[in-house]
Design a protein with these regions (language model features):
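Hydrophobic, aromatic-enriched alpha-helical segments typical of multi-pass transmembrane helices
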Residues: 1-187
Length: 187
């Protein structure tokens, strides 16, 4: 039996979940006048930067996980695009808090978010082809990657998109902690 080489990635993904929850709470606190001094834009941006760094590493390790455990290479190009797009979107959000007008921020988010959403949907679709259930986490993780961008594009369902992203981060951490080997396929 092979040792699980992805436990560190699982812990990093777990830390990304904690940072994501902290970021969401701080963002909401910054909108309430009584707490706006506690949750300053710098603190919210720091939480976002930590979350993005941790989540980016976890997604990067997902590529190795899929390659090593399942010999799955159909997402090798999409995962770096997701990581790069997530970093670009995070930097855009951080810089929009300090430097940009709301209209310019919205245009920037759309310019980065729409292509990132398309890549995410394609990634979710391709992930369904993995030979194995990844302890039952494959389908929910794939469907989250297909549904979350649609929620964000609808704007009305953006809070649901946030919850889906959080659930996706949790599933990613759980996938790294599994010791499942790929199912044998007889032809």
């Amino acid at each position: 039996m092979k040792a699980n080489n992805f436990k560190v990635a699982g812990w990093v993904a777990t830390a990304a979940v904690v940072a994501f929850v902290a970021e969401i709470i701080l963002t909401f606190m910054s909108q309430v006048p009584a707490y706006s001094e506690v949750a300053s834009p710098r603190l919210v941006s720091l939480a976002l930067a930590i979350h993005i760094a941790l989540a980016s590493y976890a997604m990067h390790r997902l590529r190795g996980f899929l390659n090593e455990r399942f010999e799955f290479h159909r997402a090798d190009v999409l995962i770096p695009l997701l990581v790069g797009g997530g970093i670009a979107l995070g930097l855009a959000v951080i810089s929009s808090r300090f430097y940009f007008e709301p209209a310019i921020s919205a245009i920037l988010m759309i310019m980065i978010g729409v292509p990132l959403g398309v890549v995410s949907v394609l990634f979710g679709y391709r992930l369904l082809a993995v030979n194995g259930a990844i302890s039952g986490y494959k389908k929910p993780f794939a469907y989250i990657h297909m549904l979350a961008p649609i929620c964000f594009l609808s704007v009305i369902f953006a809070p649901l998109g946030l919850l889906l992203l959080l659930a996706g981060q949790i599933l990613l951490a759980l996938m790294f902690f599994t010791d499942e080997s790929p199912e044998l396929e007889f032809v």
